[in-house]
Amino acid sequence: RETFNSISDKVKFFIIAIDGPSGVGKSTLSSLLADKLGGLYVDTGAMFRCLAWRWQQLDCPEDDDALRNLGLQTRIKMASNQIWCNSTEVTELIRSEQVSALSSQISKFPVIRDIMKQKQRELVEDVRNSGSFSGAVLEGRDIGTVIFPNADIKFFVDADPEIRAQRRFDQLRQKGEEVEFDIILQALKERDAKDRNRSVAPLVPADDAILVDTSKMGEQQVLNTMLQHIKMIK
């Protein structure tokens, strides 16, 4: 396996930030990239989904104190492609359309974003100090603009809404869920609008992010494109 340090020995511990809208394939690409480079894959979107799931379970009110307590009392662990939230394995539970919608909703609160920013930075620092990985590949909203603005390289992955909706439709059908394409497309467009227009940390590419449009590219082609950019780091 080619490690990041064999690509550029000038970076002792790399941080790669991958951002982009919902349903664009960030999770799969980030996981493949981390495996290829010997880094830890951190799905920050899943961290927000864990909060959204607990929010749903506890019926937590929408005030700062309650949300702060929710954030501080939520313990998230990622290991072996599984996600644990306060001792409950939630890998599949947090992938429902309902939790997805709640995740977008809860992420609009500044108090939640501040807590999650701290949790994400602490996670990466723990990984750095452990020496277990060559670096970290972080995927999710605001990674390159807010959480790690000094990341070694930033990607903003995008694709046409119709193509993203089709991918999501196929994914849910494979899981045996009864879904309608038009409903998924409408929900995706609504989430795009909310994410791009929200007042707190809107979805925008970092000024120095590399834009990757996956609309007409296969998975391996996208991965190779990203690796070529990484090899050019000086």
Which residues are covered by each model-predicted region?
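NTP-dependent small-molecule kinase module
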Residues: F4-K10, C85-T91, F169-E177, K194-K234
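Hydrophobic anchor at the beta1->P-loop junction of P-loop NTPases
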Residues: I16-I18
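N-terminal phosphate/diphosphate-binding loop that engages ATP/GTP or pyrophosphate donors
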Residues: D35-E97
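P-loop (Walker A) phosphate-binding loop of NTP-binding proteins
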Residues: P21
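Hydrophobic positions on the alpha1 helix immediately C-terminal to the Walker A/P-loop
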Residues: L29
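An amphipathic alpha-helix signature
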Residues: P161-F169, F181, L185, K189, ...
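Conserved lysine of the Walker
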Residues: K26
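ATP-dependent NMP and nucleoside kinases share a basic, alpha-helical "lid"
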Residues: T91-K175
